Amino acid sequence: MKTFAQLRLLLAAAALALLSFSAQAQLSIEITGAGASRFPVIIPVFENEASLPRSVSDIVRADLERSGLFSLVDIGPLPLPEGQIPDLGSLRSRGADAALAASVFPQGDGRYEIRFRLFDTQKQTELGALALRMTAAQNRITAHRIADFVYEKLTGLPGYFATRIAYVVKTGPRYELQVADADGMNAQAALVSREPIISPAWSPDGGRLAYVSFEAKKPIIYVHTLATGQRQVVANFKGSNSAPAWSPDGQQLSVVLTKDGLSQLYVLNADGSGVRRLASSSGIDTEPAWSPDGQWIYFTSDRGGSPQIYRIPTAGGAAQRVTFDGTYNVTARPSADGRLLAFITRNNGRFQVAVQDLTTRQTTILTDSARDESPSFAPNGRMILYATDAGGRGVLAAVSSDGRVKQRLSVQAADVREPAWGPLQKQ
């Protein structure tokens, strides 16, 4: 767990001991806690699914089960064809509250169309239908979108399966910035270095990552276009350049610079131009994060004597303190709907993930671990990804915003840190 004193060392450009990942390995996910009541649903084998090179329904089932909100009702190897209304009463008698009927149609051009309908077995009604076209290589993203469809229809919240996560992993002297699907699969290295990589941050469109690299023997902020691999230096000033955070429109970054002395907040354009200082204080200001409406920037500061979370208008003005419970609260990250603020709090000497309801100001500690850091919300605000320690090495973990659903993501023989949850992938 990074203490605020250690952040001082970072901002003075001291090397951080980070954790990362191996190029070929995949994250494995273990569900360590589930919702109090799970929704029983049938996701059968799709009709004509054998025509696909790889299964799609298996991935849909895995997504929904991993969420901790659903229990899968097995009806055996028989499909429920999309073109027929199933015997909903019979499916209800098997204990299912909902059922997916789906069929695969080869298109003759190397593509496939998957048509599916979701039914409420209790009300005997159809909840919705959709058709998705895919190539053989798109089986995973298509499955994630089907799972998102089911998730949204049954919970009322957008799904988060068709998203990607970024994280830094370390194997021996090798650091890698990895990007993977939210289920840990399809991991690819965006950057490999023998020097630390920290603070990855997704652009709102999911096409770019901003991060800090020490490859030039000092912390420099880069913006990396994932589709092309092209990188651009956006902050390489005297001293430390750290903690990039994107504005909601993707046009600007808030960063922390020490070019004028102490670490202070600045805003600049995404190409590195138009640098302006946002705030001045006699303490350390760091870890900025934009509010979803773009009107505020949350940040960590010790200006009041202990590390606490503040916010400041993006147009400039007086800072307002946000956290008052405890003597150590850092790394604020707002949910996409602006309702919750996730952060790290120190509780009886343990560093844990907490959330504050920004309307009621009530704070809830979500985890029972001791060395949590780097919280990052899923796009729907339901889950929070974070880094922690397990068995003497770094792992990623996720917890629902109510604390009930818990997951652990790890890689064999590697350390993983610095997670960032990306936006929904475009069609």
UniProtKB/Swiss-Prot annotation:
It is found in: Periplasm. Its main location: periplasm. The lineage of its organism: Bacteria, Pseudomonadati, Pseudomonadota, Betaproteobacteria, Rhodocyclales. GO terms for biological process: cell division; protein import. The keyword Cell division applies. Residues 1-25 form the signal peptide. The gene is tolB. The Tol-Pal system is composed of five core proteins: the inner membrane proteins TolA, TolQ and TolR, the periplasmic protein TolB and the outer membrane protein Pal. They form a network linking the inner and outer membranes and the peptidoglycan layer. Belongs to the TolB family. Part of the Tol-Pal system, which plays a role in outer membrane invagination during cell division and is important for maintaining outer membrane integrity. This is Tol-Pal system protein TolB. One of its GO terms (cellular component) is periplasmic space. The keyword Signal applies. Pfam families: PD40, TolB_N. It comes from Azoarcus sp. (strain BH72). Disulfide bonds: none annotated. Keywords: Cell cycle, Cell division, Periplasm, Signal.
